[in-house]
From Swiss-Prot:
The lineage of its organism: Bacteria, Pseudomonadati, Pseudomonadota, Gammaproteobacteria, Alteromonadales. Belongs to the SurE nucleotidase family. The keyword ATP-binding does not apply. This is 5'-nucleotidase SurE. GO terms for molecular function: 3'-nucleotidase activity; 5'-nucleotidase activity; exopolyphosphatase activity; metal ion binding; nucleotide binding.
């Protein structure tokens, strides 16, 4: 039997993780371990100064008082009876495209699985109303089965974004590169009830690089976007130039 570890960053009670677990359970044994609260934007953060605690829920899910990366690390090292065949993170409530991937706890949970030597994918539902989690769950299951039958290189994860459309309205699947956004808009300054100044992060930047071949473009056309992401962040095409640069310092 196939063993799958599922996690997310929206929290253990999120609709997306419930739909994902249900879809994958049709052909695999699934362990779902996720944060006990919403951890959107947690990126690859780990909890280093406090202990992690687990709470076994009535539906079989495991809630952890930690980050998405904590959840995957803890599950693989301590909670899984057998090592998972694959880690699946999602289904995120909202897209993770372009620059979003650097901040995403959804992507980070998948990356943590890859750090520990396992195939991994991150899945997000791209849209505003977020009505069609079942569509994302359907394509998640399809992609997972494909990965298990035909594994990819070990230094990558797949970042999957699914349009918020009925299954029959999806035009297909496109392999894409990450697009990019303009810089984020300014902070929102306001006051708390006591009159003290507080700040909220402003809206994300508008799409800057959203042309043909990008994840933004695929989603806008009604296609599922699959972007391979590498764990190695080295800019190899800059190494020679940097070698020259340090000689003239």
């Amino acid at each position: 039997m196939i063993n799958i570890l599922v996690s997310n960053d929206d929290g253990v009670q999120a609709e997306g993780i419930r739909c994902l677990t249900e879809a994958l359970s049709a052909f695999a044994t699934v362990l779902t371990v996720a944060p006990d609260r919403n951890c959107s934007g947690a990126s690859n953060s780990l909890t280093l100064t406090n202990p992690l605690r687990i709470n076994n829920l009535d539906n079989g899910f495991v809630a952890v008082n930690g980050t998405p990366s904590d959840c995957v690390h803890l599950a693989i090292r301590e909670l899984c009876e057998q090592e998972p065949d694959i880690v699946v993170s999602g289904i995120n409530a909202g897209a993770n495209m372009g620059d979003d991937t650097l901040y995403s706890g959804t992507v980070a949970a998948a990356m943590e699985g890859r750090f520990l030597g396992l195939p991994a994918i991150a899945v997000s539902l791209a849209g505003k109303e977020l009505l069609h989690y079942q569509t994302a769950a359907y394509f998640s299951a399809k992609i997972v089965q494909g990965l298990l039958a035909h594994p990819l290189a070990k230094d990558q994860i797949l970042n999957v974004n699914v349009p918020d459309l009925p299954i029959e309205a999806i035009k297909g699947i496109k392999v894409t590169r990450l697009g990019a956004r303009h810089k984020a808009e300014g902070m929102v300054k306001t006051q708390d009830p006591a009159g003290r100044e507080i700040f909220w992060l402003g809206p994300v930047g508008k799409e800057q690089d959203a042309g043909e071949g990008t994840d933004f473009d695929a989603i806008s056309q009604g296609y599922v976007s699959i972007t391979p992401l590498t764990v190695d962040l080295t800019a190899y095409n800059q190494l020679a130039g940097l070698e020259h640069w340090i000689k003239i310092l």
